[in-house]
Amino acid sequence: MYEHDKRVVLTLDAGGTNFVFSAIQGNSQIIAPISFPSVSDNLDKCLANLLTGFDTVMKKLETLPVAISFAFPGPADYRNGVIGGNLPNFPSFRNGVALGPFLQHHYGIPVFIENDGNLFAYGEALSGALPMVNQQLSISGNTREYKNLLGITLGTGFGAGVVINNCLLNGDNGCGGDVW
């Protein structure tokens, strides 16, 4: 889908225990993953490790990134980049943190944040398990095509994403598939 896209995007898998940073170009990871503790109970240390992680990746790049895109666990105002609420894995974000605007101001590039379960499920629906299953069905002569998927993430916490008729179910808090 994006294999010929030469733009570089910084990435982050934000877990309750660790942040894992990298960069992608096209459909390929171009920097080996770099981990830092998330320090999720101390906002200042958590934000400092976010900046350190992205800075470390940027020093390894040959070209400047055009955006930051990453997954974050739990409910949030993902459209506006505000993370907060009852997040057991990130107690320091309880009162809300404008993480997207903070990173966009610091790096001067767009920031896209989405629920981790949603990104996992949508990725599998677009270019992972779902197309693979449909291709195997087609090869075997079966005309059935699946358009629905439930993806489950397991880490420090538990998350999920739901795709129905090839559309991601976001819900009113950005995590329509999560179980609370």
Describe each model-derived feature in a short phrase:
Residues 2-8, 31-35, 42-45, 104-106, ...:
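Glycine/GP-enriched mid-protein hinge/lid loop-to-helix segment characteristic of carbohydrate kinases
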Residues 44, 48, 67-68, 76-148:
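Glycine-rich phosphate-binding loop and adjoining helix at the ATP-binding site
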Residues 19-24, 159-163:
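Short beta-strand scaffold segments in enzyme catalytic cores
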Residues 13, 69-73, 150-157:
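Short beta-strand segments
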